[in-house]
């Protein structure tokens, strides 16, 4: 490689807003961004919808964003793939084998997943269709609903429960438990949260209500929104039986593997388990939609050139700069080092908006100054994770923290002769309220920035898509783009 070493900074949830009072990024104090970045070549990238392999108008998310950034091509995402094939799910051989085992044992099917129309981790329609197919096979279906309130409105669960009940009222299908995703979908090793969800789902332990609506209304009366609803048992549900089957409907892996692992270790008598997709190479559970092979991602190409690379993030986004950025491959490529910085142990990140950005940046600066890496990929989680809390002042502080960290990274990269490329995976923090003034905690479909700093050659940037970032980096490194990468370099000579 005769080109430049590159430091790719992914600012999770940092979208291009319109600069109004709802835009925390615009409102935050960020001297580095306004003085240095504003003078660098920059452009905008599409990070949602069909440009990242999602349905048209579907907001982007961290998994999809990192897959697109690393793959250098538009990858048909699991949501699109499942939507295209769910109509024929009744003939899926994995589902039929799963159902046959339940019928032979005279058990019931437990369906668990995110009851939401947000389409980020799961989709309510998938739960409904799978439940009806199984019920038509004369299998009793019990649903363990994970409430969202994060990728959708904070208090929208009653709408989703009503829609589910209306869709399945004529079938032998009922809700057995409900849990806020804060408990059922933790990914930060907060096992006390996962434990509460597991006990409700597997053991029928926890607050008990006659129906899901009553549980939700009780939670609202205590000022608790959907995301944080304490795992609760519905009706006379009694827990798992060894003859039962478990079907998980989330199609994104990072927030389902923790509770799945707990079920596998603590409910070993229940062996008939099926996932929507493959959740991990280390978890041997069959899936309705087996994984695709995404080869010649950015990391793989750099590795094949015999060059060293570094992936670094705090816990909340570690899977994104490793597993997802590498196209679903868990093991590091030859020459790839990984650093994980523990995320702070707080209940919600508005309580500590800086998260672990500063200690992570200290390690990052040391690694940049060592000059041993040709490619460094770092994720700053703050704008997204704090943005999801809906706390405007906390998000503004988070943005200021990122800005201070970027200044340190910029200085280190300049000293080491490395090019710094700043972008994001999707929008979030640039929209904190909706048109009614209600806190807006979901992702947006806005474009995201692409900024080129410290480049020793005179380049400009044109607008593009997330999948164009990998080809852009390869051009900076003077490495040939593989045929599999259909994205284009966004560099233009000045």
UniProtKB/Swiss-Prot annotation:
- Cofactor: record remark: Binds 2 manganese ions per subunit.
Pfam families this protein is in? iPGM_N, Metalloenzyme
Active site: which residues? 62 (phosphoserine intermediate)
Keywords in alphabetical order:
Glycolysis, Isomerase, Manganese, Metal-binding
**Could you tell me which pathway this protein works in?**
Carbohydrate degradation; glycolysis; pyruvate from D-glyceraldehyde 3-phosphate: step 3/5
Instruction: Tell me which cofactor or cofactors this protein depends on.
Output: Mn(2+)
What InterPro entries does the annotation carry?
Answer: Alkaline_phosphatase_core_sf, BPG-indep_PGM_N, Metalloenzyme, PGAM_B_sf, Pgm_bpd_ind
| Enzyme category, top tier | isomerase
Provide the residue positions that the database annotates as binding substrate.
Answer: 121, 150-151, 181, 187, 252-255, 317
Instruction: Give the enzyme's EC designation.
Output: 5.4.2.12
Cross-referenced NCBIfam families, in alphabetical order? pgm_bpd_ind (TIGR01307)
- Family recorded in the similarity comment: Belongs to the BPG-independent phosphoglycerate mutase family.
Function (record text): Catalyzes the interconversion of 2-phosphoglycerate and 3-phosphoglycerate.
Which PANTHER family does the entry mention? Answer: 2,3-BISPHOSPHOGLYCERATE-INDEPENDENT PHOSPHOGLYCERATE MUTASE
The name this protein carries in UniProt is 2,3-bisphosphoglycerate-independent phosphoglycerate mutase
